[in-house]
């Protein structure tokens, strides 16, 4: 049996459809169509959980730290941009607890998450997606801090939002402690991530 492919004209249509229709996996909405994302790699998942544990250890409530499951609506800035992302790690604000009781989706009408981290997968397409496209989309919704975690280079790039664009706080290598503007209390060395 062939199913008709559904096209959406708004993000709200997609949300309504996905609330009412059982869907397995994660999907990005690109040009009105659902595009299934591949499962996360074990490495990406492991890195996200390691970071979660460190944030919880410094007192961030566990219900605010979400590895890989939080959907974030983003503006479409370039042709073929996704209208939503599933970052490898999202740190929510307290007010999100009330706003996401029914569905773990941060929409454009909500305050942005405090931090988003992406584990960069190999390949130019993946690097461009994380370093260029997602960076611009997360800045556009006002995410104060964006981390790019690169397992190949064994580095963490920390970006802090200044105005409408990100400023590079630093690229931290193996022995370095990560400098977070949003979470000054954080004590995390890059080697703890990899």
What positions do the PLM features span?
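Gly/Pro/Ser/Thr-rich low-complexity, intrinsically disordered segments predominantly at protein N-termini
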Residues: 1-194
